[in-house]
Amino acid sequence: MFKKIEEVSKLSGVSKRTLQYYDDEGILPVKRSKNNYRLYDDETMERLWEILWYKEMGLDLKEIKLILEGMKQEIVIEEKVNKINYTIRVLEEQKKVIEYIQRYSIPVKSEENNQTYKDQIKQIRKEQGV
């Protein structure tokens, strides 16, 4: 049995505009009625369920499309986990700098050595373990 977009929107919690966008982008292709209404069958509803879980994992539509077009889910998810781990490392480093500055304030720059400001920052971070 087919569902119309209004029913699918209500059932899924996804806006009609988003459902239309998914169809337009080929992520959630749907059948059309004689009057060109979008019609969702059980298979399409199952695919929408998968899309929502992939979105919950933080995958973007490009990544979701790769999976739906046949790329191994494990590969896409592993890449996503690697990106997340990298972001976590960057944020942890930024947090260290913030905590250092909260404790000691911004270090005084030196005009006497011939280092650039960026090089001085790198040196201070290295010396202070920040």
Regions found by a protein language model. Give the residues of each.
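Short, charged amphipathic alpha-helical surface segments
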Residues: L52, K65-I124
